């Protein structure tokens, strides 16, 4: 049985950079839910858009993100540019 694939985009500087201390727990939750998770930390403005547009077509079943409203905005903007629309999840930082 193949596992569903998730791209998890996160901003390591969001929320007073506390995501780093919770990252493994979040990935563990997704893994237990049946996902093979690829974690992608953003480094600069626009990285979320670029990651979604370049990495998701035909490969991932879902995109999740964690960060502030800018991270969520970038992921949704990237998804709107893709022909195939995937479910998007959000974990506030």
Give each language-model segment a name.
Residues 2-93:
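Small-residue-rich beta-alpha loop regions that form the catalytic core of phosphotransfer
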């Amino acid at each position: 049985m193949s596992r569903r694939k998730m791209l998890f985009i996160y901003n390591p500087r969001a929320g007073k950079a506390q995501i780093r201390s919770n990252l493994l727990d979040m990935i563990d939750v997704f893994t237990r839910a049946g996902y093979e998770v690829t974690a992608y930390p953003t480094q600069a403005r626009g990285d979320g858009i670029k990651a979604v547009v370049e990495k998701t077509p035909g490969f991932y079943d879902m995109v999740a993100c964690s960060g502030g409203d800018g991270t969520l905005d970038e992921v949704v903007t990237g998804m709107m540019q893709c022909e195939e629309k995937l479910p998007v999840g959000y974990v506030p930082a």
